[in-house]
Each structure stands twice: as C-alpha cells, then as structure tokens.
Amino acid sequence: MNTENGVATFFAENRYAAMYPHILAVPQPTLHVMKRLRAAGIRVRVEPSDQRPLCFTFQRGIGDWLADPAIVLLASIPVNIVSNIVFSWWQERKRRDREFPSATVAFVVEEDGDTRYYSLDGEPMSRQETHEISQRAQRSAKVFYRSINTPAPDPRRRYPIQRDHSGTIVGWAAGLRHSEKSLDLVDVFVSDPIAEADIASGKLAGVSVGAIAQRSTCSICLSNYVACDHIAGDDYSNGRCVVRIERALPAEFSFVQDPINPETKILR
C-alpha cells in the first residue's frame, strides 16, 4: 500500500528535561523505532519541530529499567502497515537483549475526534492499557524532577543517587567517570544507612546511569547516529552496528542490585 502521503509523528520525551530543559530528545528505544520506519520508507517527524538538534536519552549498567514507551501517531498510514514493519524485528531485538524488557511500542490513530491506541501487534488496547502507557513517561519525568530538586547537603556532590530508580535518594556523587568498559561514580557519599549496609554486603552491587547523548556516531556509516538508519545491535552486510557516544550529559544515577555491566563501580 502507498504510504507516500502518510507520516509517523513522534513526540519528544526528554525524561531529564528538569535538568536540561532546552534539549530536544527521545528515548533510545524510540529512536530505534524511528530508524526502522525511516528505513522502510515511512516519513517520520518529531514534534516540536524546531531548529534544535535531536538527541536521545540512554541508560547503561541497568538490569531492570522501566523504559519510556515509544508512542507513534499515525496519519494516513494503516496500523497494520507499521505493525508489520516493526513487530517481528522488535520482538527479535528484545529476545536478544537489544532492548529493555519493559520497552513498549504503541500506535495512535485519531479518527473522528477519538484517539485510539493500538499495541505492537496492531490490536486495540484496553482503556487501562491506554492510560498506563500514556502516563508512564510523565511519571518517570516527575520522579526525576523530584530527585534533582532535593537540596544537596554538600555543593561538591550535586548529583543525587537513587536506589533502584525508585525516586528515593540514598546518596550523592560529585560526577561520573566513564570509558568503553566501565562507569564509575566518583566521590560518593551514601546518606542512607540501609543502602550503606547493602553496599558493604554486596547486595547493592553496582551503578546504573541515565544520560543524554548529544553527539554519537554510527560504526557502520561513520555518520551522525541519530540521522542515519542503522540501528545499534542489528547486523548489516559490513558488520553489527555499534553506537559510539562521544558527548553525553549525565543526569540520573542509581545504586542497583543486578547491574548488566559488572564493571560499573562506586568510588568513595
């Protein structure tokens, strides 16, 4: 079916807007869906549409993360068309741990003044499912807003550290040191005695970090990762795509029990 006049619209969802209000960003899983549709010939746009460069939020060292949903507003494109493009590819990425288990995709169609949500397989979503997915991104942004607006007890350590992304602050850090193999929270003060004991016992074994990628490069075409159609973790004729994040704005830190990357460390 011809989709030349149709468009898939994504709305910027910067969960770290409270710290970086002028950054236009989408979550990394959302960017992947955008790339998949673009590569299939679907016209894609991001709202608000202005002169700011598009960035993406990302997380590293995280075992369990409630990812913000990728919500796609479809205009003049049948739901089954985009579902066929995305469904099997997305399920395979999740099976291979290329996406967070909680990452979700929903399609939205406005018909006769009524807004209808459809799941990844193209089936209508229930009212409860619709409410949950439409509120999820707002909730994560509110949790982050509360955490960064908590006054730091020491101005040298201005980054709050949560426990398991719960919104509860249990410590503070001066900053982040990162390399290709590790993520280290630097000059950490643990303010919560329970968290302190759990770190000492190994129950809280590592750190997860959320940030905004301002500059990134695709390993396949060596161009701007946001603008190209290659997707990190997918295989192409000349290899597997890897995104190289060259400039990032640190935003969110959390002590976690089961970090994906065992090299994430807490430096006291």
Task: Identify the residue ranges that each predicted region occupies.
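Signature of dsDNA virion morphogenesis modules
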Residues: 132-268
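Short amphipathic alpha-helical segments that predominantly mediate membrane engagement
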Residues: 1-71, 87-141
